[in-house]
């Protein structure tokens, strides 16, 4: 009995969201803690989710001319220090290698927290003429940042990501690329992960160290906290000048190039868990799920059941990412709970009577609804159901985002809305850093972004009363 109940043993989501989250991560076998403090082991099921994200995003990148490359994980200290704002922004998070081969190194090497400096150094060697531009490079790799407080996928010292770095002939072209990649991130998150995004520009306080401007795709979790899901940065010439990325322009004159960078990470796995989470474990959108459907034979010990259901599975396994659960050491109930915990979108149940009548039962992971269909129609029915689940999961998140987005006209109202409703709070903003700091100090909520879709909510800033022409969104974050 204890074994059958094991998959149900997760903390109530309303009682302790953080504990619920780590319970799901471990019991759905997505990741586990290691003896290396602050670093996780991503298990095969969790890594399969990342592979699906990677496959989808990489194809989108290549459609717009991006090519993959790879840079060293070790960066010399002198290289890191070439861009002052950048090194100051990352200094507290950098891990250093000081010994090699039993000897002290002449120069410290940092373990890659991000690769702007290494990419810029190499691009400077490769760019001579405007004909060499643009360079549209991306790498899928690991990075290390010495985080003090860690949580699986959301904030760990070592994590996986992609970082794109591009070099352009003109500022206009670079700015267009920055927004183009942000749109691809929105596509990945909305169409693959079924999570609606809020797109906008970060305030100068919140933008990336060394950037002229940072753009973000923000997401809202089931508990009303925000998660920054991806960012795209326009650097202007902030890196090309110190790193001497120059080219001969069309008039034969030498000038500095323009640069961008953009990235998403395994943090998106955390976003999927928390955006679609509820008390019965993991719930995965079909397009990103490692297993889209599982076939569980009922009364498999009865004559012909295993053979016939196995044949049905064989007819479907090349159409969908599927599993056939023919384990004989656990009950069907355990199997149901096990696959629910793993978030498999569709369960197919077929027993002896179903086989006699030519029927199968489809069970939706997102709603627990049971649907009886003809076995001969299974392929079409599963295909349609997976699309329905994908859309319904997205729409449920849209509805929650709308319900948890409020408007405030005073600092007290911002505080009240966040206390009562969590979520996003929209206000006008004068643009002053002091007002931004005040909201964070009083409410604990930093600015999320200045949305691309602006609304004129009022004429003045709710914090200082000065004239305001920008709408900004606030929200507590992960």
Kindly label every feature range from the protein language model:
Residues 1-478:
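NTP/phosphate- and nucleic-acid-binding module
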């Amino acid at each position: 009995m204890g074994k059958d109940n094991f998959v149900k043993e997760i903390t109530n989501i309303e009682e302790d969201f953080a504990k619920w989250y780590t319970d799901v991560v471990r019991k759905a076998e997505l990741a586990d803690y290691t003896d290396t403090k602050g670093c996780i082991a991503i298990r095969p099921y969790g890594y399969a989710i990342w592979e699906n994200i990677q496959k989808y995003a990489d194809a989108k990148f290549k459609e717009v001319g991006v090519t993959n490359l790879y840079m060293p994980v070790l960066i010399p200290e002198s290289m890191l220090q070439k861009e002052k704002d950048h090194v100051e922004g990352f200094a507290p998070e950098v891990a250093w290698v000081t010994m090699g081969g039993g000897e002290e190194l002449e120069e410290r090497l940092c373990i890659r927290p991000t690769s702007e400096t290494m990419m810029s150094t190499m691009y400077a060697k490769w760019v001579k003429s405007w004909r060499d531009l643009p360079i549209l490079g991306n790498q899928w790799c690991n990075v290390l940042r010495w985080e003090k407080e860690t949580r699986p996928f959301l904030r760990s010292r070592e994590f996986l990501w992609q970082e794109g770095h591009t070099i352009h002939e003109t500022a206009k072209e670079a700015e267009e690329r920055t927004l183009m990649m942000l749109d691809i991130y929105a596509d990945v998150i909305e169409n693959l992960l079924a999570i609606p995004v809020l797109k906008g520009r970060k305030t100068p306080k919140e933008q990336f160290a060394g950037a002229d401007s940072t753009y973000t795709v923000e997401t809202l979790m089931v508990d009303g906290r925000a998660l920054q899901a991806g960012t795209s940065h326009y650097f202007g010439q902030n890196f090309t000048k110190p790193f001497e990325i120059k080219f001969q322009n069309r008039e034969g004159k030498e000038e500095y190039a323009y640069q961008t960078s953009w990235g998403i990470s395994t943090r998106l796995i955390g976003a999927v868990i928390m955006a679609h989470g509820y008390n019965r474990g993991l719930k995965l959108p079909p397009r990103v799920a490692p297993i889209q459907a599982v076939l569980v034979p009922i009364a498999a010990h009865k004559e012909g059941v295993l053979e016939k259901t196995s044949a049905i599975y064989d007819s479907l396994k090349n159409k969908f990412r599927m599993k056939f659960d023919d384990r004989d050491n656990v009950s069907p109930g355990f199997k149901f709970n096990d696959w629910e915990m793993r978030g498999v979108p569709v369960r197919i149940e077929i027993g002896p009577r179903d086989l006699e009548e030519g029927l199968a039962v489809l069970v939706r992971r997102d709603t627990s609804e049971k649907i009886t269909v003809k076995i001969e129609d299974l392929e079409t029915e599963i295909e349609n159901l997976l699309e329905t689940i994908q859309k319904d999961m997205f729409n449920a998140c849209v509805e929650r985002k709308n319900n948890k987005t409020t408007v405030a006209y005073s600092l007290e109202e911002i505080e009240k809305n966040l206390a009562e409703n969590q979520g996003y709070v929209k206000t006008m903003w004068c643009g002053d850093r002091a007002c931004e700091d005040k909201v964070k100090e009083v409410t604990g909520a930093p600015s999320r972004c200045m949305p691309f879709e602006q609304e004129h909510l009022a004429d003045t800033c709710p914090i200082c009363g000065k004239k305001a022409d920008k709408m900004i969104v606030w929200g507590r974050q992960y």
